[in-house]
Design a protein with these regions (language model features):
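Conserved SAM/SAH-binding beta-strand->alpha-helix loop
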Residues: 106-108
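A short acidic, Gly/Pro-enriched loop at the edge of an enzyme's catalytic core
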Residues: 135-142
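Conserved beta-strand signature within the Rossmann-like core of class I S-adenosyl-L-methionine
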Residues: 172-179
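N-terminal auxiliary segments of SAM/dcSAM-dependent transferases
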Residues: 2-32
Length: 181
């Protein structure tokens, strides 16, 4: 059912979209595939001047360069970017020659990344998947979770994700994430 159908507004459906969720209330994956929401989220990701769905271009460049230097990212390294959105960090990591896998739940973001970030790079793979459902084994030198995603998870999801990331990392691998304090 759509909010606007046959020139009529479905007020109860509209109300569902404007209700503020309780803290750590479980949402649905369908949120990310809603045509209007996913389009607006992608537009926000791609706006280099505001921090709404992604960080500003200047911040992305600064953080990516810090991460690249901190782990000596180069060809032969394998990187997992969880919640990669349209691949803004993936692109920066791939420039080093590292093999980079980006995972995101939004089909629109993954499609954008495949069409606009991946061309010219044979060392990038984008996967449309909820990162809570990943199952990699000792594959990566680095896993990242950027833009405060960890804070949006409830405690059991945080524990489950940390376990999955631990399994995905090689011995002595790194997990870099940011939180709001």
């Amino acid at each position: 059912m759509k909010i606007l159908e046959n020139n009529k507004i479905n007020l109860s459906l509209l109300n569902n979209y404007i209700l503020q969720p309780k803290i750590f209330e479980k949402g649905t994956d369908k949120f990310w595939d809603d045509e209007h929401i996913s389009e607006q989220m992608l537009n926000l990701h791609l706006n280099p001047d505001i921090e709404a769905a992604s960080k500003t271009k200047e911040t992305i460049d600064t953080e990516a360069n810090f991460i690249i230097k901190a782990i000596d990212m180069k060809k032969g390294k394998k990187v997992l970017d969880l919640g990669c959105g349209p691949g803004l960090y993936v692109r920066e990591f791939a420039k080093t020659g590292a093999t980079v896998t980006g995972v995101d739940i939004s089909e629109r973001s993954i499609n954008y990344a495949n069409e606009n970030i991946k061309p010219g790079y044979d060392n990038i793979l984008f996967i449309k998947k909820n990162y809570l459902d990943i199952n990699f084994r000792e594959s990566f030198d680095l896993a990242t979770l950027i833009f405060y995603d960890f804070c949006a998870l409830n405690t059991s999801e945080q524990i489950a994700l940390l376990s999955k990331i631990y399994e995905a990392l090689k011995d002595n691998g790194y997990f870099i994430f940011d939180i709001v304090t």
